[in-house]
Amino acid sequence: MTNQAAEVAKRRTFAIISHPDAGKTTITEKLLLMGKAIAVAGTVKSRKSDRHATSDWMEMEKQRGISITTSVMQFPYREHMINLLDTPGHEDFSEDTYRTLTAVDSALMVLDGGKGVEPRTIALMDVCRLRDTPIVSFINKLDRDIRDPIELLDEIEAVLKIKAAPITWPIGCYRDFKGVYHLTGDYIVVYTPGHGHERTEAKIIQNLDSDEARAHLGDQYDSFVEQLELVQGACHEFNQDEFINGQLTPVFFGTALGNFGVDHVLDAVVDWAPRPLGRVAHERTVEPVEEKFTGFVFKIQANMDPKHRDRIAFMRICSGKYEKGMKMRHVRLNKDLRIGDALTFFSSEREQLEEAFAGDIIGLHNHGTIQIGDTFTEGEALGFTGIPHFAPELFRRVRLKDPLKSKQLRQGLQQLAEEGATQVFFPERSNDIILGAVGVLQFDVVASRLKEEYKVECAYEPITVWSARWISCDDKKKLEEFQTKAMENLAIDGGGHLTYLAPTRVNLALMEERWPDIKFRATREHH
């Protein structure tokens, strides 16, 4: 095996998906603790104080104590290199969160054991399904009251349409939480409270049918054995092929706050989740062990560093090897550049990078020329697919406070749209500017960045738009006829693409029925 192939085999690139407050920030900290990337985990409560959680950037995040921006953390674990892509976890996350899922090879789904499957989890799973991403599941908060575990597994299967295969099973919960039983390994991992902030070796009891296990479970022993028989009879067994194809998820139980069960999940990512996979481009499929470098940009982040008013383009490496000072081609602009200063991330601590391999995420300094979806190669003209725009779910009309600044407004919005901070639509019938977003917070972010970076103040007004659909049609005459009839609701987006802004769900359904030859798409590929 060549050095490059060995490096690729060591890589695991994944993201965490969860509903706000399911415990994602805490589990991120504990994963970093496992990888010895941080010496001691700060509890979530300290997030709003001076000790920001390691993945909180930008002024507004500091004020709100939330992580708006998707950051990347790399750490070693069991002779593997883990790339963890953090996704904004609060109620108002953005399209960035969806796009981050296009840059990973697997995902970790964190569920609150007291609440089960929640709306954001469903939305994120829909995005994972676009690429059949393998999912590992962690049912969190066992140190509190949780719902019946069998009921939780049924809900995962019914709502998320994926088979659930429990690997560990909880012994009690809240004050009676005694640990988890490993279903295939036949051993108990004992839970001892109070070790949330450090790395500790958990005590193991071999064999459920042992005096030690009986003593540990006490009064719970008989009912637990009975429950296990039911579980083993009713639940799916783990199957590697079904997992890799995104049809089955292994399920683990634990408490991230108590730092218990998190290592089981990380072991599953190392043992079962795929190494970096081949990536489809318009021209061909690119394999990770190919010698030549390729990569694509899935996110652009502004002002990570308040001292430097720069923007960083996050690039997922698909093949080859990045070396400091190498030359690469920016395919869309057909321009060669020498990259001497790519960054690797341990959250906000930026470090200069000497080399990186397929599966790794690197940061390129961007002075406004790089866009989301851009491909970089060592010369070959390639364009990777599968980095879409997602139809916004919320819309606002922009009103400028100073009418003389309309040029700055357009310039600012164009740039923010290229970064993926928002989507911009220019209606065919008016001079309005409409912004689209996936989460309410994106509007606040855009307004504060327009003010700080472009010295433009704007306000928002409500507008009757339910959703946007990108329009295409193979029949030019039909398209022209549609454009004439639907002019009222048509707009051009920031990339120059024809878009239908549907005022209601019913309206969209009617239009799709009335115009069968017109394609109304909920996603649009970049470029």
From Swiss-Prot:
Keywords: Cytoplasm, GTP-binding, Nucleotide-binding, Protein biosynthesis
SUPFAM superfamilies hit by this protein: EF-G C-terminal domain-like, P-loop containing nucleoside triphosphate hydrolases, Translation proteins
UniProt keyword Repeat present: no
GO BP term (any one): regulation of translational termination
Residues passing through the membrane, by range: none
Pfam families xref list: EF-G_D2, GTP_EFTU, RF3_C
Name of the featured protein: Peptide chain release factor 3
Lineage of the species this protein comes from: Bacteria, Pseudomonadati, Pseudomonadota, Gammaproteobacteria, Pseudomonadales
